[in-house]
């Protein structure tokens, strides 16, 4: 994965590209900068709302921060997006995450 600074150069070159924001979210999460990571994932979703894996990442971060209700809502939104775009792998992974999170309540 490129460094945060390299990803930010890509975002500066094309701020409308949702993948750059998603990559930034992944890197920030790796660096344990969870709030900033969520912001980057949301920026990615503002550019393309049909990204189930951005929702997956947000749900996982929220769950790790103890925000179960919000995590479940994010996972359900991702599942809805995965289903509507016909992505069976993302649907399966998000469905499993919803079940896991609901079981943790």
Regions found by a protein language model. Name each.
Residues 9-10, 43-44, 78:
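Canonical positions in the second alpha-helix
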């Amino acid at each position: 994965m490129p460094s945060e600074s390299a990803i930010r150069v890509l975002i500066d070159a094309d701020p409308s590209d949702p993948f750059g924001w998603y990559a930034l979210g992944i890197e920030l999460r790796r660096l344990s900068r969870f709030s900033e990571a969520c912001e980057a994932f949301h920026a990615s979703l503002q550019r393309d709302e049909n990204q189930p894996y951005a929702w997956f990442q947000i749900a996982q971060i929220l769950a790790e921060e103890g925000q179960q209700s919000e995590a479940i809502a994010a996972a359900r939104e991702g599942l809805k997006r995965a289903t509507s775009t016909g992505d069976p792998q993302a649907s399966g992974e998000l469905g499993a995450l919803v079940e896991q999170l609901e079981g943790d309540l």
